Amino acid sequence: MHSWFKTCDGLAASLPVTLKRNSVVLTLTILLLSVPAHPQSVPNSPTSANDLARRVVTNELTFQDDHTNWMYRLEKEQYGKKQVEEIVETKEGSLSRLLSINDQPLTAKQQLEEDQRVRELMTSRSAQQKLRRARDAETLQGRRLFKMLPDAFVFSYAGDEGNLVKLSFRPNPSFRAPSLEARVFHDMEGEMWVDCKQERLAGFDGHLTQTVKFGFGLLGHLDKGGHFEVRQAEVVPGHWDMITLRLEMTGKALLFASIGVQKKENHQDFYRVSDDLTLVQAADILNRPLVVADNR
């Protein structure tokens, strides 16, 4: 049930702290979810680029209700620090376990800290509630951002690359962004890739066309040129998921504090787990990595 809606999280992280309503939101995840049971085919009749974008958005939102759970490996780099984690999705939220830092396995002390963190989540009702609230918040705001995609931009055909059709996009001058996050989103231009056979969103690559100011610049701003990139693929037959995230944003918060977000993520080694999996069962899986690896 992993979705690109977790991607908008990166955009949210680039906003001045005083302006963020949900630090866990924005996962522009702008895209995704799971698999079409009956994918729509592209009609033979000419279709405008905006109509194609709208159909893709409708499909992705429809497929969000997929409730399959997956285990996968996350490689991420932020502020010069590299981490590798194993993630297991459950009906109660996702559980992660840190495997390495800067290409080095965890020390004995770090292993104990990870054990304690996972154990605390298993026994703390408040921690579990916080996890569920974060999941619900990111899903809700991700849907809102994704839903406005066809209205926020003007699309045009820009060629094709293999099985993908490339659409270029620019801000729609008549669109009025309803939120700060939407303003950052709307002030981008770039390219979007669509798998026309299944009408799935395969990629989104945008950059800020101008400096985005908050509170007339008094509360902060994001610099022109900030870059956001997401890739999605059919990771196993019939299942689409996010595989790559890139985010680079700079700016100022409250006139003085610098904003510098550089984030990279790669998602790989997807493995189906039970749709009824609990957090306790996920913790057990994460403690048996060799067994899971043998099943891949």
Show where each model-derived region lies.
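Sec/Tat signal peptide C-region and signal peptidase I cleavage site
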Residues: 35-39
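N-terminal polybasic/positive-inside topogenic patches
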Residues: 16-17
